[in-house]
Each structure stands twice: as structure tokens, then as C-alpha cells.
Amino acid sequence: MITNTEFDVPVDWLYKGKSRRKTNTKPSRPSTSPASSSSTSSSKNGDNSTSGNRSSNDKPRARSSSVSNAALCNTEKPDLKRNDGNTSASDTDNIPLLTPINSGNRSDSADIDNPATVDAIDLIDNDDNGSSTQFVRKKRSTSISNAVVSSKPRLASSAINATASSSVGKGKHPPISSPSNATLKRSNSTSGEKTKRSIFGSLFSKRSTSSSASTAKKPLPVVNTSTTENESGGIKAVATPDPRVKEISSPMRGVAPTASKPQTPILPSPALAVKDLSTVSLKRVSFAVDKFESDPPQQLPSRTPKKGNILIPDDMISEVPSISVGISSSNQSAKSTNSNIKGPLYTKKSKEYILALENQKLALREAAKHQQEAHFAANRIAFEVANFKTASDAGGKLTEKSSEGTITKQREEVSPPNVEADRELENNKLAENLSKAGIDKPIHMHEHYFKEPDQDKYQDGHSIENNEVTLDVIYTRCCHLREILPIPSTLRQVKDKTAPLQILKFLNPKPTLIDILSFCDFITIAPIHTIVFDNVALNQDMFRIIISALVNSTVLDKLSLRNVRIDQDGWKLLCKFLLLNKSLNKLDISQTKIKSDLAESLYRHNMDWNLFTDVLSQRSHKPIEELLFNGIQFSKIPYSCFARLLTSFATQKNFPESGIRLGLAGATTSNISQDCLKFIFNWMSQYNVQGVDLAFNDLSTMIKPMVGKLSALSYDNLRYFILNSTNISTSYDLALLLKYLSKLPNLIFLDLSNLSQCFPDILPYMYKYLPRFPNLKRIHLDSNNLTLKELAVVCNILIKCKSLSHVSMTNQNVENFYLMNGTDSPVQQTNTDGDLDSSSTLDVKGQFAKNSFSSTLYAFARDSPNLIGLDFDYDLISEEIQSRIALCLMRNMKRTMDSTFQLDELDSQDDLLFDGSLVTMTAESVLEKLNLLSDKSTKVKKDTTKRYLLKKYIEKFHILHHNVQHTIDTMFEKRKSGELPLQEKENLVRLLLLEQNLCNILELFSHNPNLNDVLGSSRDDSKESVDSSEDSKLPALKHVESGYHVPEEKIQPENDVITARPHLMATDSGKTIDVFTGKPLVFKHTSSSTSVGCKKQEEEEGELHKWGFFVQQQRSLYPENESTRQTPFASGDTPINTETAGKSTSSPSVSTSNNETATTSLFSPANPKILPKIPSGAVLRSAIMKAKGIDSIDDLIQNVNSNNIELENIYGESIQNSASTFTPGVDSDVSAPNTDKGSVETLPAVSTDDPNCEVKVTATYDKLLNNLSMERSIRL
């Protein structure tokens, strides 16, 4: 089975980004709620006090009133250098920007700096007594409360004093001037300031502030419950002291022995952490698909209910009647708003209300009385029915026994037990009958009286055999069972689809609980491979319902929870889900969008990553192949935790053979540090890693480590390398990466998008290194602000990469497509005179750029054999080019699927015609642009891009001209043998017209003096073009300097026939001449190097050459016509098919085989006759002019063609003698169209009496081809 991965590279796991990110501005961190921001600022202040206070206690008090980012940067760098000399400057520069510090880190960092508190931290892991853990529990809970709520300052101070006293009690040195003492006093002062503000706020604006801070206080119960458990306290320590632990652990992770102390409270016991998940329950009741075959009957409530006529007394005195709640009608809502403004119509003391209340009480008493009477009547009827049933059963048995007449005394004595046995048997039979009985379904029978019974049986049998229900029916029933209508966004995705479903997205961003319940009922029973909940606002109950619905799925492959809010309890549910689910292999828990009111505890980097790591290592089912952590700031978690996470991911049980993929793309800031990046490259080299998504991370300062790892380590398994929006500053840095990436053997995808600062300077390096990639299949160059001229250069580069199957060049700058800015626009503006309109110049340039790029893009799609995907802004090119590109991609797909696929001749001819029309359309713009150039345009002459593109265009033009000539000659050979169908004859006419147009354009190019000025010397161009692979397809040229010359050893020896002919060509001095056509090519050395005599000689030889070629053509025509007039057909002979008409009119000067055919057709092989020598020179020319009364050879040729003047009048008996030696069996119907009456008689198939129209059309095409072939012979 052929999968999609065999044709293209899947990139659905890569992060595309929200929008184009500006590389200059990178926010340090996302904004938070006011409560969290205030706590962050206070925590930063606290950190300054702990890091900068070594000498005295007055400095932190003086600095506590001001919170400045500049102070943070200035005070923290020297402190880090004092603490550890191994800390680099780059690490310290990034710490204040990448890692926000909270108050929880403040206390822990102070404890780390203080040796007394370091021993207190050791008590967390070593001691299991209640005393030590109580101190830690109090200290951490109060630090968190100080950061978030800051409402218990005295509790914090007492906890800190308790910690200090415990350290002194253990025999440690008293904290006389230690930073911990300063920290204790500082935390009291900070909390005291907040207490003062809260006192004044309670008098004035406490109620207003409490409502705004309510959202920040909601996470408190989650934090407190997590700290009550013994292990969870250690787990919470992972989330809070991230920056300080990173500062100490990251420089010492090599051999430093003291790194184990701060890492001890961060990494809890893996067995205990996973054991805690046993209390998490994921049980859920689901529907059975095979039990509800029909839609359950129900009464769905209307969306616009009507107001009733009955009004109870309570509704009379209420503001909004309860019967009106939920009515969504506009009119009724308007009435209700008006009634709310006026208030209730009645009061409790009103007469109407009292009367209605008394009537209601009376009605209730009457209802109770009737209800009691009905109850008694029902009981009486039930009692009578029961007695009647027993009596009837007994009477029936007695009558049966009396009728038989076999009652004896023995049976009468034992009759009571027999009666009981009979009753049991009857009861059993009744139970069996009742078990078989059921409700008649369907309730509503739709009878069709005009159907045949056999048809109904067939349909019923077919429905029983194929009882598979579509997914939209199942989803509708699930919603009906919840008494809601189906959600349209979900119903459209499952409409008329059967199981299994490939992907299902929940597209409601703010769902209700009933929506989640109905959706989860569906995904529980329907097999779905990929389920997406991206950007859905879920609470804790909804998240639990979703996880419980998917935990037992055996088909689920991928679960996407991007930007879904997950708290600590939800994280445990997710870990339990990963531990129990047996089919999941792709998980997306990215957090790329962070709301401003999101609490700090709900950030992904504050989750329990140690628990997640342990679950990955202990998961024994299908391994995880793809983990996407995009947007998660791993720079804020400890380095050891990050390394352990990646290692457990790469060392799973049942590791996949295809490899693993990891997503670490940044969203708002850069997520990885330099140490993490080095570990990632070592990790990719050590394990079977397909790729790591590093997009949207700032890698501008990490090029040297990346290049060093790529050059030193082997990456045989690496298949993806993503540099999208990585802020690489210079093209040289990107060129270094391309140099070493080109050596990777299995790299199939390269992403160079959003690197506009490196373009177009990187294009020469791309030209050098991209063809060296051994297996590159897909490349992305999106959003690089490339102009059409630069895109054309990219296409010419990518055409050399034959293994490419997909190219993306979307989202380029639209303004540059018209070349309104850049280097081209000033050239035209400065060089324009008063007579030249600048607007028209810009239009010409824009159209030229569009036409040139369209042809280049089409050539790229046509000449790339494996290209099946080309992403581009197709609105910028014409619809005809779009359709042609799509056709080329479809052909490449067929060629990829079927190795024996070949284009037929009609398709190849059609492609050649389209290429010719496209090149000629571009040639007009090229000529106009060349005419606008002047000698002062030095910028254009020095523009290497323009020279390169123009040279490629000229090469493409000559290749096309040669292909057209070769195709015409091949088709004439088929026409000579009678194998050319009618449709190919039509294409042959078009190709002849195209060839004539191409020759005219080449003639115009050859006389344009500005062309050589732009291209430079032809010798330089020849050195580059000789090495190209297309040289074998080009025609042979006389001069080596042309750059298109084929070596002489490759030319066949049949060219001797060509050189033996007279009047074959007239060589122009100083020009590059085609041996076959005799026409000068574009490149010429000098335009005025010949003298007047030489020009006169060239003119004379050119006229004689033209007349000699015409005479040669007429000689091949007249003997055949003469033979047809003299020799009639025999009785047994049949006339030759008209498709062979004019077969000798094909150009005898294109290939050697045609030359041999033309030569053998002139003479009879039995009686060869040498033609008399034709006079030449000025004598012949003057004699012809004088005798015939003409001014030029063109007039003489016109007299022969138009005025029916035969060659016998010019050459006498020589032509008639040659006619007698010619054999009559060779194409007697080939003639000039208007020579004489005999030529018309040579087309016997064309007659007005023949009703077949195809024969007439064929004859018409033959005449037209004869004319065109004659003109082509004269022109050549």
C-alpha cells in the first residue's frame, strides 16, 4: 500500500506560528494578572536583597522601596560571578530576561546561599520525622502565600524565625550578619508595607480590590493541597525555585560535587510519584452502539418557547415570572424588560392576589381529595383482578379433570401439590413469553403500498447484513440522549462518514458542560485516530470528562491539548492517562497563547515534570513517537530535569524504529538556553531522533555551538532541521549551517522561512550547497521578502536539486513583485529623459518581471521529475500558467506512482508549443527592456543577477529553438512514411509558425547592440555554459567562442554530405553561425569590423545562396511532376496516399539522415547523372539581372512561384534531361501548390464528390504544409 509519506514529507507536527514575528522585539515574558505581577515585582526585590547583601543590613532596606529592572541587572551579575567563577557572561545576561523570579524563589535562594539553610534542605530528603517536614512545610506555604496573597505577614516571620532557631539548635553558627538574616528582616518589612496598605484599603477600597484579585486567589487551594502530602511538597519545589537552582546547577553539571545539594529537593522519588496516581479515578459509563439501533423518542424543548395562559399567584408578585425565564424571543424579552422597569403589577395586599391565593388553596385541596379517591379505586381494582386470576386458573383445571373422567381418590389426595407444580410451570411459561415480548418498533409505521414484497425483503436483508451506522447518526443520538441538539461544527465533520474517522476537532472555544458530555459520549464509542481540543476553555470537570472518555480507546493515535488550561490535578489526570492508554503515540501539550489573567501556577513550566518523566519511562504500551512542547519555557526549569525528560523520552520501552520527534518551538520568547541547546544536539546524535523543532527561538548567539556539534558528531538518523524564525543575523552564519547540513545523509526537510535578513545574500551559498544535499525532498522558503527576480534565481537553483518533491515559497512581499523599490527603480528614474514616461517604464518592468518569473517557475515545475508540491501565491501569475504547473505536478505524480509512465507525442508537442508561446511572450518584454538601456546604465551592467537571468534566458531560447527544429524534422519523416495523423499535422503547422517566429526573434537579438553590453564577453559565458548538461541537446556551431559548441568528436561523419553541397550557406564574418540553419546567433564580436567590400561580397553570396537553395528545391519537385504527367498509373497500381505529399520538402539541412534522403531522391541509383555546373560570381548575377529584367533574386523567385515561370525557361534542357532519369514511383503527388495544372491532378484523394470531410481536411493540410515547408527551405 502506498502511503502519503512515500511521496511527500509530513510536516503537520511543526509549529507554524501565530503571525510573522519581528526579530528585533522579543518580550522577556508573558504578562500576568495584577496579583501575580505584584508578587513578581516583590519577589524580584527580594532577590536583590539576597544576592547583593553580603556586607551590611542597611543596603537591602534602602533598596526595598524601589523596584527597577536596571537595578536587577546591575546587582545580579557581579553576585553570580562572586558565587561561582564558572558562570559565563552570556548566562548571566539572559537570567533577568528569561527567568522571572517570584517570592517562593526568594526564600529558597536565600537558603541556598546560607549554609545553615542548606542543611535544612537536606532534612527534606533525609529525615522522615514530622518535626523537620513541618518546618519545611510551614516555610514553603508561607512563602507562596506571601507571593500571591500577602495577607499573613506574621505567620511568615514566625516560620522564618522557627527555621533560624532550628538551625542554631543544631549547632550551626548563628546568623549574625548573614544574608539570611537580612532576608528575614527584609521579608518582614515588605510584608509590613503590604499590611499597612491593606489596613488603609479596608477603610476605603477593600471591596473594590477584592473582586479584582479574586482570580488570583483561586489557585490557592490547589497549592495548599499539594503541600499537605509528603511527596507533593517536593514536587512543588520543582516549580518554584527554578531560576536559582538553574544558576547553580547549570555551570556545575559537568563535575561539580556541590550540584547534588540543590537538586535533591527537585527530583522526588520516582516510585512514590507514580504510586500517587493510583488514587486517581478515570471510570466512566459509555453507551453501547449495538443497543440503540433507532433514535430514542423524546421531546426536545423549543428554543423559543411561548408564554402560557395559566398564572400562579407567585408569578403575580414577582419581578420576572418563572415561566418567562429562558424565553429568547425578542418581542417577549422587550416586554419583560418593560415589565421589569415598571415592577410587579400586584402586591401581597392586593385584592386580586388574595383571591388567586384562596382559589389556589381550594384547588389544591380538591386535587388532593381526588388523588386519594383515585388511589383507593386503583387498589380495589388491582385486588379484584388478582382474585379473578387465581379463581379462573383453579376452575379451568377442575373442568379439565372432570371431562377426562379419570379422577381417582389417590389423585384427589395428592392434588394440592400437583396444583402448585402446575402453577410453577405456568408461571415459567408466562415468564418465557414475557421475556420474548417487547415494545413494537418503530412506533410510527410508514406503509408503502406500491412496493413489491420482494423488494422490502431485500432491503431488510441488506440492512441487516450492513448494519453499520454512519457517524453523524451516532453523534445525533448521543446528543438526543443528552436532550440537546447536535453541534453544527461537529456534525459537519462527521457527515456521511463511517468509522474509523481520521481526525475530529472540537471547534467550540467556550463550551458548556452538556456540550462536553455529549461530545465525550461520541468519542468514547466512535473510533477516531486524532482528536483536537486546541484553544478550548476547559475547567477541571470538563478536562476530567475528556480524559476519562479517551483512556480506554484502542484507536486513538494523537491527542492535541494545545493552549488548554491544565492545573495540578489536571496534570495528574494527564499522567494517569498516559500510563493507562495503550494506543496513543502523539501528544501535543503546547502553550503558545497565554492570557493576561492566567495564574502563574497554571504555566506549563510550573507543572510536575518529574512525574511526567517517570510516566514516560514506566509506560509499557505503545511508545510515544511525537511530543510537542511548543511555547513551554524550559529555561525556567532545572537543567537536570530537562535532560532527564529528554532521556526518558528517547529510552522508552518498545522504542519506535522510525524514530521520535520533539517540538521545542518558541511562541513569545526563546524557550531554550545555550546549555539546553548543546544537550539537544548531543541527544540527537546519540539516539534515533528524526528532528527537533527549534523554530521561533533566538539562535543568533548559538551558531558556533551548533556548527561545532554538526561538524564533530554524526547525525545519521536526523531527517528534519528547522530554522524558521530563528533570528540568524548574517548570511555567513546560515552558510556555515548549510555547509555542514549538506553532509547529513538522511536529511529530507529543511526550513529556511522568516529569515529575510539573510536574503538575497545567501543565494550564492544556496547555489553552492543545496545541490550537495543527498536526499533533500522538501524545503520551505516562506516569508523572506523575495522579489520576482530573486525568486527566479531560487527556481534556477532548486532545479539542480533533482530529489525535491515539495517546495514552499509563500507569503513573499507583494510590493516587490512590481519592482517598485530596490535597485531597479532608481535606474529607470535617473535615466529617463523628458520624452519617457516613468509610469509606463515601471509597468513595463513589472510585466517583464511577471512574465520572466512565470516562465521560470513553469520550467522548474516541468523539469523537476520528482516535484509533486509547489506552494506559491498563485494569484500573482496568470491562470494559464497555474493550469500548466498543475498539469506538470500531476504528471510527476503519475511518474512517481508508475515507473513506466511516458508522455505521448501529442502531449510533448503541446508542451513544446506552450513553451514557445511563453518564451515569445517574454521576448517582447526583453526587447523592450533592452531598448530602454543606455550607455550610462552602469548599474545594470554590474548587476550580476540580471546578467545571470538574461544568460539563462538566452540559453533556454536556443534550446527551445533546437527542440522545435528537431521535432519538425521528426514529424516530416513520419509524414513521408505516411504515419502522421491529422492532429499531429495541425501541431506541425503550429510548430512551423513557431519556428518562423523564433527565427525572427533571434534575428532581432543579433542586431541589438545593448545585448552584448549587458552580457559581457562571450568567452566568459562559454566557460560556464560548456559544463552544463544541456550541451548535448544544442545544435553544432562553427565557432568555439559561442559557448554552445559541441565537440567535433561527437559529430557523426555523415556531415561530409553537408559540406559537399554547393550553396549551403554563406558565412558572415565575425558572427557565430549555426552549421545547419546558416543564421547568425546572438553573440557577435564586433558590429562594424568588416569593410564595404566584404559587406558587398556577403550580400552577393547571400543572394546566390538563396537562389541556389530555391533551385535545389525546384529540382526535387519538377521531375516528379513531369513523371506524373508523362507516366500514368497502371491498372493494378493504386495512387499513393495523400499523406505522403511533400515528403521531400522537409528541410534537408537539419540532420544527416534527411540529407541522405534528399540526395538519393535527386538521382536514380541505376543511372546516376551529374548535374551541369551552375555559373557563379558577379558575371552570373549581372547576366541574370540583365536577361530577366529583375532587380534582385527575390524578384526572380517571386516570378517562379507566382507568375508560373518554369525553370525550363531559365536552365534549358538540363532540367528536362534530369527529369527523364528520375523514377516514377517516388511520391508523385509532391508539388508546389500553384505551379501548373498538373500539380493539382496529383491529389486524387481530394475531390468535391467525396462526402468524407476528413479527406478534404487532410488534403488542405497537405497543401499548407507544402507551402510552409517550401518557405522553410528557402529561409534556411
UniProtKB/Swiss-Prot annotation:
Q: Where is the composition biased (Polar residues)?
A: 63-72, 178-192, 1124-1143, 1154-1164
The entry lists its GO molecular-function terms as: protein phosphatase 1 binding; protein phosphatase regulator activity
Q: Which stretches does UniProt call biased (Basic and acidic residues)?
A: 398-417, 1018-1036
Q: Where does the record place it?
A: Cytoplasm; Endoplasmic reticulum
Entries under InterPro entries matching the protein:
LRR_dom_sf
Q: Subunit arrangement? A: Interacts with phosphatase 1 (GLC7).
- Protein family: Belongs to the GIP3/HER1 family.
- Name of the protein in its database record: GLC7-interacting protein 3
Species the sequence originates in: Saccharomyces cerevisiae (strain ATCC 204508 / S288c) (Baker's yeast)
Starting at the broadest rank, the lineage of the source organism is: Eukaryota, Fungi, Dikarya, Ascomycota, Saccharomycotina
